[in-house]
Amino acid sequence: MQIEKHISDLLYRYQCVTVPGFGAFLTETVSAHVTGSASSFFPPKKVVSFNANVKNNDGLLANHVALQEKMSYELAVIKIGDVVNEWTYLLQNRNRVVLKNIGEISVNNEMNWVFEPANTVNYLTDSFG
């Protein structure tokens, strides 16, 4: 199961998507801006961040997975837990977790998780005409 696709889908509509037992992906709206030197215009966008301290299951992701994958809520929670175990194992062994269209989580020298957002997707639907 590609859980990152489900997270990505939800980031268009919600400010916070919690992956139970792992952490939460948060979005913050950034205003449009123009660069002076190149006269380039950048539309408003949502910037994604990650908080490893928010781990409680709010049901949002599991409900979405259950509906989209046509499975029970309970099975969705189990499948998400399996993915969380895989990601945690990778990070504990100093590997990176790459989440397509969301970002990359790695471990620094102090064994803290570091999130680098992907800049390939604008989750702010108001930016599109």
Please state what every model-predicted region is.
Residues 1-129:
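Cytosolic/nucleoplasmic/matrix-facing N-terminal domains/tails
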